[in-house]
Structure formats: C-alpha cells, structure tokens
Design a protein with these regions (language model features):
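Conserved long alpha-helical elements within nucleotide-processing catalytic cores of c-di-GMP signaling
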Residues: 27-46, 50-58, 64-84, 94-98, ...
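Short catalytic/binding micro-motifs of nucleotide second-messenger systems
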Residues: 48, 85-92, 121-131
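A structure-centric signal for secondary-structure junctions around beta-strands
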Residues: 53-55, 90, 134
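Hydrophobic, well-ordered secondary-structure segments
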Residues: 62, 105-110, 124, 128
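Short, internal active-site loops enriched in acidic
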Residues: 62-67, 142-146
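A short glycine-enriched loop-to-beta-strand structural element that forms part of the catalytic core
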Residues: 95-106, 130-159
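The C-terminal output helix
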Residues: 162-167
C-alpha cells in the first residue's frame, strides 16, 4: 500500500493539468460549451423529449462575411458573452465552427424559439462591434423538423442558408 501524502507542488509526468469541470466543458475563448458537449446534450435531449413528448429547439447563428473577412478573437469572445446573456440558465450554447454558433433551447415551442432566435440575431448585430452587421439564423424544432440530431442540424443549416440576411 502506498501513501501519497500531500500533492507535490510540481507537475507530475502525465498530469500536467488537472481539468476542472469548467475547463472540460467550456471553451476558454467564448465561455460557451465545447462542441462535443453541446452535441452530447442535444443527443440526450432527443432521447428525453422523445420519451416524454416534449419539444426543444436548435438554433444556429452565422455572420454574413465578405470574402476574405474573418472574425477576430475579440469579436468571438464578445459573441460568446452576448449569447450567454441572452439565454436561460437551462439552455446551452456552443461555437460549432469558427463562424457558426448554436444554442439548444430546452422545453421550447416554436414561438418561443423563434422569438429567442431573432432577438439574439438583433443583439449580435448591434453589440458585436467590429463584426458583421447582419447575421443569418437557422432554427430546427424537435420533433417537427426531425427526430434525430443529424436531421435537426441539417434543417438548421438549410434554414441558415435560406436566411437572406434581412435586417432585424
């Protein structure tokens, strides 16, 4: 039997960092959930809502960028703040790609999800300085638009590409 005693001040080989739940689940740059956790929670929500006959929504937001234009790290951090402030504590958000952001709205019907999607679109357009002025939005509802994660993401992506970027 080995006695470990107090942890060493230095780092042990193979244990360079001890990950807290926040660093494992949240992206440092945005403060939003990491993509793997977001997708995991959407899968769980599909199972839960199928079992209990509930609805939820997945929303994608994406800035309209000119060719060669990119979001700065500062703009991405501000986007994370704006999205976190605009969601309920029960909802989750993530940065899926460099320019694509998503939210999982738990227990949300169509009208609620649509209101959140467009309110957030307006907040992003007005509060992310240095970023693009218009944002595209894609909304998919469970079970109306699909009953599995790939289908819901495809529907949200399709609606995102159909959004003509009309100002909010």
């Amino acid at each position: 039997m080995f006695f470990r005693g107090r942890p060493k001040e230095g780092k042990e080989p193979g244990h360079e960092t001890r990950d807290s739940p926040e660093t494992v689940l949240l992206d440092e740059a945005t403060g939003l959930c990491k993509t793997w956790y977001f997708e995991h929670r959407v899968h769980e929500e599909v199972q839960r809502c199928a079992r209990y006959g509930r609805a939820f929504a997945v929303i994608f937001w994406e800035p309209r960028l000119l060719p060669g234009e990119a979001l700065t790290d500062e703009a991405i951090a501000r986007i994370g703040v704006v999205i976190n402030e605009g969601l309920r504590q029960t909802d989750l958000a993530a940065q899926l790609e460099r320019t694509r952001f998503a939210a999982l709205l738990v227990e949300s019907e169509h009208n609620t999800a649509r209101t959140v999607a467009y309110r957030m679109k307006g907040s992003l357009a007005s509060r992310v300085r240095g970023g693009p002025g218009t944002w595209r939005t894609g909304l998919a509802l469970f079970p109306d638009d699909g009953v599995d994660v790939p289908t819901l993401f495809q529907v949200a992506t399709r609606k995102l590409s159909e959004d003509v970027g009309i100002a909010v």
